[in-house]
Amino acid sequence: MRNSFITLIFLLLLSGCSEEKEKVVEQESSESITPAQASTSDENNNQTTETTTPAVITPAVQEQIEQKPEVKTFKVTFKIDENDMVLGNKDSKIVVVEYFSPTCPHCAYYHSTIFPELKQKYIDTNKIAYVTREFIATKQDLDASILARCKGDINSFMLFHDIILKQQDKWSVSNKYRELLTDIGQLGGVTPEEYKKCLSDDKITETLIANTNFITKAPKFIGTPSFFVNGVQTENYSINSISAAIDKAIEESKNKIDL
């Protein structure tokens, strides 16, 4: 079944994004993905505008297109669900959802330079619930994301999340990326046997596919990293943009209480 999942992941559709005008998106996400090209972010001059680059569909993947996995439907929204990795206050009325790809250079930049300030200001003070979700565009993204979720707890997830992004330039461009990820796994306490088992865990893969399918329907989503504050997408991933959106949501929440 995993081969079919890999096939479907390479056939993600960004060009067919929803033309709906609502900023808050809620839909049912299925593992059945319409054939098309996937997209990831590309470098730009100001480090705050997302662009996309189509993923390559290899001949080996193309040969598997006819294979169909069992269809299971996940309900994905911009609210917290049982499959989410959450930092901060899970009971907060302010939910920030970050979409990233393990192979995305902008995502690595964000996490090394912007996220620490955001964490100190809003997460450590329990002002928000911060959800990190993956956008899967390549096999490398899939395998790295599975490693990060392998143990299933937020501490392990964030540990691998940090290592994977810091060492992105080493494993993501290597033909031996699986071996390198296996080595990274051992650094974080995941044995090669455990990682192999997680790679065959349909539930993890299904969650990643569902999250990916969901975000492609967001009207303004064009790549990673992308951020949504209570379902409303921020202008970019600068600290000023994200902070402004969070502060606005906090103020609106206070006003509702006052009423």
Swiss-Prot record:
What range does the record give for the signal peptide?
A: 1-20
Q: What is its EC number?
A: 1.8.-.-
What SUPFAM superfamilies does the record point to? Thioredoxin-like
- The identity of this protein, by name, is Putative protein-disulfide oxidoreductase RBE_1288
Function, as annotated, reads: May be required for disulfide bond formation in some proteins.
Compositionally biased residues, Low complexity: 43-54
Keywords assigned by UniProt, alphabetized: Disulfide bond, Oxidoreductase, Periplasm, Redox-active center, Signal
Which GO MF terms does the UniProt record name? disulfide oxidoreductase activity
Query: What disulfide bonds does the UniProt entry report for this chain?
Result: 104-107
A Pfam family name for this chain? Answer: Thioredoxin_4
Where does the record place it? Periplasm
- GO cellular-component terms in the record? periplasmic space
Q: Where is the composition biased (Polar residues)?
A: 33-42
What PROSITE patterns would the database entry show? THIOREDOXIN_1 (PS00194), THIOREDOXIN_2 (PS51352)
Species whose genome carries this gene: Rickettsia bellii (strain RML369-C)
- Family recorded in the similarity comment: Belongs to the thioredoxin family. DsbA subfamily.
Region described as Disordered: 25-54
Q: Mainly localized where?
A: periplasm
Q: Which residues form the Thioredoxin domain?
A: 47-251
